[in-house]
Structures are given as structure tokens and as C-alpha cells.
Amino acid sequence: MANGVIPPPGGASPLPQVRVPLEEPPLSPDVEEEDDDLGKTLAVSRFGDLISKPPAWDPEKPSRSYSERDFEFHRHTSHHTHHPLSARLPPPHKLRRLPPTSARHTRRKRKKEKTSAPPSEGTPPIQEEGGAGVDEEEEEEEEEEGESEAEPVEPPHSGTPQKAKFSIGSDEDDSPGLPGRAAVTKPLPSVGPHTDKSPQHSSSSPSPRARASRLAGEKSRPWSPSASYDLRERLCPGSALGNPGGPEQQVPTDEAEAQMLGSADLDDMKSHRLEDNPGVRRHLVKKPSRTQGGRGSPSGLAPILRRKKKKKKLDRRPHEVFVELNELMLDRSQEPHWRETARWIKFEEDVEEETERWGKPHVASLSFRSLLELRRTIAHGAALLDLEQTTLPGIAHLVVETMIVSDQIRPEDRASVLRTLLLKHSHPNDDKDSGFFPRNPSSSSMNSVLGNHHPTPSHGPDGAVPTMADDLGEPAPLWPHDPDAKEKPLHMPGGDGHRGKSLKLLEKIPEDAEATVVLVGCVPFLEQPAAAFVRLNEAVLLESVLEVPVPVRFLFVMLGPSHTSTDYHELGRSIATLMSDKLFHEAAYQADDRQDLLSAISEFLDGSIVIPPSEVEGRDLLRSVAAFQRELLRKRREREQTKVEMTTRGGYTAPGKELSLELGGSEATPEDDPLLRTGSVFGGLVRDVRRRYPHYPSDLRDALHSQCVAAVLFIYFAALSPAITFGGLLGEKTEGLMGVSELIVSTAVLGVLFSLLGAQPLLVVGFSGPLLVFEEAFFKFCRAQDLEYLTGRVWVGLWLVVFVLALVAAEGSFLVRYISPFTQEIFAFLISLIFIYETFYKLYKVFTEHPLLPFYPPEGALEGSLDAGLEPNGSALPPTEGPPSPRNQPNTALLSLILMLGTFFIAFFLRKFRNSRFLGGKARRIIGDFGIPISILVMVLVDYSITDTYTQKLTVPTGLSVTSPDKRSWFIPPLGSARPFPPWMMVAAAVPALLVLILIFMETQITALIVSQKARRLLKGSGFHLDLLLIGSLGGLCGLFGLPWLTAATVRSVTHVNALTVMRTAIAPGDKPQIQEVREQRVTGVLIASLVGLSIVMGAVLRRIPLAVLFGIFLYMGVTSLSGIQLSQRLLLILMPAKHHPEQPYVTKVKTWRMHLFTCIQLGCIALLWVVKSTAASLAFPFLLLLTVPLRHCLLPRLFQDRELQALDSEDAEPNFDEDGQDEYNELHMPV
């Protein structure tokens, strides 16, 4: 009473008041009229009425009061980032050093006691702890310690402490009577000598807007006792900012402080207190829990320190992306909800409206106008970067508040916009997963949402938002036609929110992916579009929002009226496509402000293509778009690489660029090249052993997987079919000296040894077409010279070992780099022609022996042949044990033709079925890969069902025996069996040994080079020198036992590697498959070779196979080998007009006549090799094949330019692992 202050009813502690000086300086003339109004307000009679008639107190509405300690707590916590106002005043004395810690605590305690006493005259309007003489260093220490000086305020008529709340918003005073709202007790000013008139105004204080307007014109007026420091009076809507001359102008502080501070300080205070800085401004004024200890208690300080330690560093590292576009739609009951309409992992997938299913992935096509509107939207919309929120209601609340402050929406639309953002989300897979029992996602009403997800500020965790009921009031209806919209349940996270997730889609999303949610839609209550771009501080899992449980990092919200020209769907697709772009996605992670996002959009526009608005009749009209797009992407990558190099050259690496260096960087260490020469004898062999053999234990462990079992069964049939086919043909060529049994034994023995000792155990050793051609040529040479064929092979094998040792010692494997596709195509084309020719030649011989005659021999002649030891549809006896095969049999030629063509077409179309659209990918692969065994089985059954027609069968001995026991044994004497082997031939055998070495070297090393491609991602390495040494040395062993020489079979080896390849499941729909790993081990090779060896016991079954069926397989191998050779494609272009030529580099970068010239050179080499092969000098055809290597590197550069040779003779083909891709025959340039 002595100080002129009347305590409020209930004993509430009043705010400290400042005495008014009795003598005031004269007022300026422009404010005298306002002084009269102020005098009426502060009249003595008015205070007498207030004293005599105190206002009635309603116990049901507890009041809220703030003491000076509350404001001190606000200034000394981390929410108040600016310096105290008293620091702006001139210091009364010189700054002093900080006292010891104990002295500081004593002084704080003393100052705490002073805060409850009214200030003396002359003190600043707002008291600061420590005064102006306290160093700023002490304030930093107090902020780090997280100490709080707030004391509980006793509410009137209550025995329990009432929590002080600071609510945020500008619409508070317009919604009185809300539950839970506390009335603020305003202090009464001191009575001055000029307040002698009766009051003319109401006792209630004016509204904050009126007070702000009045104070705006009183800057020059000295301090008035009517100044108040209530937070409600300092708040303002966003529309009041930036309008100095309007009625809504706000001032950052009271008149007295404004008089003592400069304009720069006032602008800084206005920016801090009145403006909004998204991502920086703290929206919460939160007091610590009442259960914490006092300011000096270590137990009360520990939780604050723990919270500070838990704060994580900002993660600016770009992650993989998953984008989901949700549009605001009405369901069947006309209730609004968010409906997923599109998604992006790398390409766009849209939901088809009619069928509610996902369409095919495609490259998103955007309109140029939508991109410009998006850029303008981000430039003028809200951008909240590094937002520290972990719940959808918290994010939505801050987004709505930011929209209000930025004048995008009105304050009265707060509730409607918030309810719209919290509507439930639905996805196309929801109904599919429910089946006959559609699920009903759990949702709650508005009150339960607020109660469960928004605890009070005193006890809530960090980042919690104030109670939205304080700001929303009665929620407005979302849609005009639905007056009961406030009763509709909102969609909030539930326990089983992801029951309808698609597991298949989840497998295609990378593990470290972070999602982007795009929300767009039309609402009737907004007058203009409102948008917000949000980047969370860390990715959080917002349940039931996305189709799959992926943590969300980015959100984009775009709401607006329907009467605008903005296409919200196209704008949502634009931002979603931008977020799926790699460079823009990285820029969004690294952006520090709005301008970085705008710059990233400009970069995206620089790499985009605008197609004129014209009708496109066919795909040929868009052929140039892909090439132009590739050129733009190349320039874009060059710009990014230049930026990275400039950043690295500057001595530092920008945050977020480390990933780019890791992925595409030039900082990678050079790999260990297995073909690099060491300069020492057997240096390459030693490196192969040291590189590969340390992985031997893992080669055994890695085989313990079911995929290896499936690969064994598959490759077994893939290896057995060529062994039977080539074995039967080899028996025909060598007159039974080597046949099926010898080839099966050789494949089994050499396969087991190579798998156990080889450097690349994934290679499959086997017989091949070039070796068959060489065996035929060497057999004819021995017959012409009257030499023993098998004895000559012994000496050829011994010389082969010598040459292989010399080649490996000199590290000659590097020569494989000089074998270009020019030579490989000639080699493969020649072998394919030989296969096709031999097939029809064998068929011609069948028609010659069994011609189509009008009259055939009588039945007795056929019966006589049967009595001689032949069955009508059985196997002929060995040629040496019975009479020659019968001739002139009816229908034999026609049935052989049917069996051959049937086998070929079944195997060929099953291979084509592999790339068709029928069935699933895995089923098609299995059927296509087993095409040869299936065709053989079908034709054998057809032949077996026809009992009255004779067909020549495969000659297979019983048990483990040679094909012709009367001609040879398992061991071949080196000096001759029937007669002595001539010594000159022992020396001359070095020539055919050199020729067979050429074939083995080319096939083995080229196959190893294909398997070791970087695209196949083999981690354990390979060994060219060790593999060549093993195959060559085992060739010498084969000569001693009369077994065929083997080499690395290209097609079978590549098929083996593909069968053991594990593909990544986290691949975006529409993207090309990527290899996760290859199960490199030795066990599958050992098992495959062992099973092929055990097939010798199936002699009874093998003897049922007609030779015509093997001719069909031979034709199949020749035709399929031609399909993957570029030479055959260029050969067809000779007969095709230029306008129908495909878009290939060898067509677009080379003139047509020069391309045909290159093709004719290759055809000339093939014709020369064919002529040599058809003469007595056929043994020399490997040497002529080797001469094509110097022809390519010495002669062709004189005829063609380097760019032309690069287009015509470049090895740019990569393995295709797509289920619908090409098969191994189309990828390889090597013969079968």
C-alpha cells in the first residue's frame, strides 16, 4: 500500500512495479491530447472504485500470473539467444573479473532474494540478473549449465502448484473462455499527482493490437507507468510485420528503453522478438519439470546435461530416396483423406485410377510451367530446414504457425489447415491386403490426439509443442457441405499402421533410404495457395503415413483453393521428381537456406529437355531425344566433377561432397591387374598363387548355400548335353577311336582337378567346336601320312606341356589383350558356319544311305538284317563286331529330318521363351536354360514311340570302357602300338602342338577375361597364368590316356557364373539389375564334373539317343552363336536401306560404305580360313586365325581412323542380368 500498489485478490504475487518520478519533463505538444486520456485512465476515483469494489474471483477459472523470475528464466535459457537489454546500457563501472565459483553461487542467492522486492527509482525497466557489470562470459556459463531460476507461483484458492504456460499464437485474445486458459493478473500503476479525475474508460486493458498502435506513435515520449511486460501484449500476427505505417505496427520494447537504445539495436530486437526465422526461432517457452531439484542441486542439473549430450550432430550425408505423392481426395462417404497417387524410387510409378493398381515405371515428364510455379512457390513459401520434431502433429503445428507468420494463411484458418494435415492416409495396397475383411485403421478424435501427442510443456520431452487447444478453439469445418466435420476422426499413428505394407516394395528400397512426403490438394477455406518445404533434423518414422515403414526426412505441403490456375497434381509431381533426382537430392540435404534450393532447381532446369507441343506419331521421331539427353547428362556430370576438383584443389572438402568422391571419384587406388607383367620368370604364376590360394578356406565355406545346389543341377545338364553331342560327332570323325565315353571321362577328370587347383574355379572346362575341327584335321593328316593317330596325340601333348611352360614362364598371358573382337568374331563366325555345314552334311549322308525310293527291298531283306543283330529301332552293334549298318531303309531319312528339325526348333524356341512375357522371370529362365535337355528328351520319346522305322543311334559302350575296345586301350604307348612311331614325327609333333596351343590359349584366356569383367564383381580375383598352365599340363596327361583335349568353354563358364550370381533386391522398379555378390567357390565345379563322370553308367539310356537328335543340337549351337555376333548384324545391313539401319555406334559414327568395307575384310578372312580348312592344309587353320591379330593392329589403322575402329571394333558390351534380357549366346563373341 505504501508504494501505491494494490495486491490482486487471492494473494497472487504482483509484478514488480517501478516508481513514477514526481517531476516529469514537459511534454511535447503533439502528445498532450494523449496525456489527457492517460490522466483519465489513472484517475484517483477510478482506483478508489477498484479498491472498494474488487472484481469477483471465479475459482473455476484459475488465473495465471508471471513474476520477474519467469522473465529472468526466459532470458537465461537457450530460448533467449540475444544479449539482455541491460547490456545495451552504459556500464556504471569497469568490468571486473569473475569471482570464484562459491562466490558466484553466494551472489546468485543474494540476487534471488532481491527479485521479489520492488525496484528503486532510477533502475532500468527490466531487471537483469547480474547487472551491466556482469561479464558475458558468465551468461554463457549459465546457459551451458542449463540452470533455471523459475519458482512456483501459488494460484489463488488452490493448494496445488499451478504450472506456468507460455502459449504461442496471435489469436489468443480472440478466443476467451477456453478450458485450461489462465487469466493474466495485470498490475495496477502507481498513483501520480496528475491523476485526480474520474476514469472515463473501462477497467479492462486494451487489446494488444490497440496498444501496439498507440505505442508506435509514442517513441519520443518518455517512460510511462502504463508499460507492461505481458507476453500476450507483445505478440502479433504475421500480417502486422513489415508495415511501419499501418495500424498494426509493433515496437520491440517500451518507450524508456527505446529512448536509450539506438536504431540498430531496436532493429535487432525487432528481428528477434517479432520476426520469424524458420528453423532457427524456438517456438517453445518450456519450463523444466517441478520434480527437478533446485538450482544448486546436482540431481536437478544432471538431466539437463544429459539432454545436451544426447543432441546429435546434423546428418547432411545424402541417403537413398523414396518419394511418395499424396493428394487430398474425397472417399465414397465424401470424407477427405490423403490418397497416394504416385511414388518414386528412381522412376515414377502412377496409380491407375480405374483399376487401382500400379502402372509401369517410367521417366517422369514434367511441364515447364509446373517447374516455374514450383520455383516461385519455394521462393515465396515457408522453408523450415533442420526442424527438430519427431511426430506428425508437432511437424504440422509448426508448419501451420510458419504459414501464419509468413502471411500465407489467416490465423482463423489455423484449425482447418491443421486438421487437413492430420487426416488419414490411404494407399492402393490397403484394400488388397485386407481381402474379405477390410481393415479399419485405428484413429482418434481431436481431443484424444491432443491429449496423447501433446503433453504439457512442463513435463513434455524436448521438441514438444504447446497444447493446440489453447490456440485452435472450436475447430472449423473442413468442407462447406459437411457441418459435422469437427467430429470426424483424424488419422494418427497407431500400433498396426503398416499392416498393409508391400513387402515386395520394401525389398526394392535401399536400407539407408529416407523418404520424402509430398502433400498437395485443394481446400475450400483458403483464399490463396500456401506451401512449406520441411527438412527434419533427423529422419523419423511417421507411422501410417507412407506405404512402407521408411523414415521421413523431407516434407512438402501445398494447399490452396480450387479457383486458382495452379495445377496441384503437376506441382506435386514436379517436387517429387526433383527429390528423386540425384543432384537435387544431394543439394536438398546440404542446403543452408532457401537460395540453395533455388539454385538446385536452376541446375535441374539446365539438364532438362523441352519438347515442342507437336503430335508424335511414332518412336522414330523421338530417337534424338535419348541422344540429346545423354549429352546433357554428360555435361552435367562434367560440371559436377569440375566443382569437386575445384573444391578438393582448394585444400578442403565441402560437407556432403565426400560421398561423391567415394562413389565416382578419381581417388580410387589402382587395382591389381592379373595381366601386369612382373619381369621375372614365372612372376605372374607366383602372383596368381599368392592372390588366389589364401581364399581356399572360404572357397569351401561359401558353397554351403542352396543356390549352389541349384547351380550344380543346372550346369550338369548344360555340360552333359555338349559332352554327348561332341562325343557322338567325335566318334564319327575319328572312326570310333575317341567317342562319348572318352569325352565324358576327360570332362570328369580334368574338371575335378581344375576345380580343386585352378585360380578361377568358376570356369567350366569342356570340349569345343574349334577343338573338334582340329581333331578332325589331325586325324586326316595322320591317315594321309600312315601314322597312328593316338600315338601322335601323345607327342603333341608332350610338346604342348613344353610350350605352355615356356609361355607361362615368359608371362605371355598379357597377349590376350591384343585379341580384339575383330578376331573373336571371325573365329566364332567360322566355327558357327562349320557347325551348320556339318549338320546338313550329316543329313545329306543319311538321305544318301537311305534314299526315298518308290520301291524298297522286301521284308525278308529287312528281317535278315535284323537277324544279323539289328533292332528296328535299336542301337547298332559296334562297327567292328557286326556287319555294317543297313542301307535303303524306308522312312529313315524323313524321320531323321523330323528329329533334327524338331530338336532344333524346340531348343531354339525355349531359348526365345526365356525372353518372352509369359510366366514369371524365374520360371522362364529355368525353362530356357534347360532347353537342350528338354528337346533331347522329347525327341527321344518320339523316336522310341515309332517302332517300325530304323534310325542310327549313339554308340556308347557298356560300363567304363573305351568306345572301340578292339582298337585301343586306356593307355596309349608313346612309341606306337601296332608299329613303331617314326622319330621324325616325334619332333615334328611340335608343330601341331603349337597350333593346338593357339586354340587353347585363345579360348581359355578370352573366357577368363570375360568372366573377370568388373561388371561381374568377382572379389577373389583370377589367375590367367595358373589356369593356362593347368589346362595345358592336363592336355599332356590326356594324350597319354587317349582322352580329348579340353579348354575353358565360354558359354558354359558364363552360364555357371550367372547361376551363382546374387542380384540385389533393393533395385528401383525400372532400373537395371545390379549384382550384390557372386558365390565364388570350388565345390560346384567338383560336383558338376563328378556328376558328368557318373553319367557313364547311363549307357543304356544314352544308346537310345538318335544321331539325328545330336545333329539338331549341333545346328542349334551354330545358329545361336551367330545371333550374338556383330558381324552377322552388319552383314544383314548390306541388304538393308540406310533409313532402316539401327541406332548403333558402328552405324551412326561410321560412313555406310566404310562400315561395309570393314565387314567385307572380315568376310575375306573367313573365306580364306574356310578354304584352308577344306584342303589338306586344314591343320594350319589356327595359325591363319592367329594372323588376324597383326592384321587388325597393323593394317586396319592405315585404312580406318581411330574413331571408326573404336565404333566397329570395341568391346563395350556389358553382361545383362535382366530377367527379360538377352541370353549368353547374344552377349559373347566366342564359339560354342
From Swiss-Prot:
Residue numbers of Omega-N-methylarginine PTMs: 295
Catalytic function, reaction form: hydrogencarbonate(in) + chloride(out) = hydrogencarbonate(out) + chloride(in)
Domain of life: Eukaryota
Region (Membrane (anion exchange)) residue spans: 709-1232
Protein location: Cell membrane
Low complexity biased stretches: 200-215
Xref: PROSITE patterns: ANION_EXCHANGER_1 (PS00219), ANION_EXCHANGER_2 (PS00220)
Keywords: Anion exchange, Antiport, Cell membrane, Disease variant, Ion transport, Lipoprotein, Membrane, Methylation, Palmitate, Phosphoprotein, Short QT syndrome, Transmembrane, Transmembrane helix, Transport
Stated consequence of mutating residue 925 to H: In SQT7; uncertain significance; unable to rescue heart rate abnormalities in zebrafish morphants
The keyword Nucleus is annotated on this UniProt entry: no
Involvement in disease: Short QT syndrome 7: An autosomal dominant form of short QT syndrome, a heart disorder characterized by idiopathic persistently and uniformly short QT interval on ECG in the absence of structural heart disease in affected individuals. It can cause syncope and sudden death.
Cytoplasmic side: 1-708, 911-925
Stretches the record annotates as Disordered: 1-316, 429-498
Biased composition (Polar residues): 440-450
GO CC list: external side of plasma membrane; membrane; plasma membrane
Biased composition (Basic residues): 76-97, 104-113, 280-289, 305-316
Compositional bias segments (type: Basic and acidic residues): 58-75, 267-279, 481-498
Protein's recorded name: Anion exchange protein 3
UniProt cross-references to PANTHER family, sorted A to Z: ANION EXCHANGE PROTEIN, ANION EXCHANGE PROTEIN 3
Lineage, top ranks: Eukaryota, Metazoa, Chordata, Craniata, Vertebrata
Residues with lipid group (S-palmitoyl cysteine): 1165
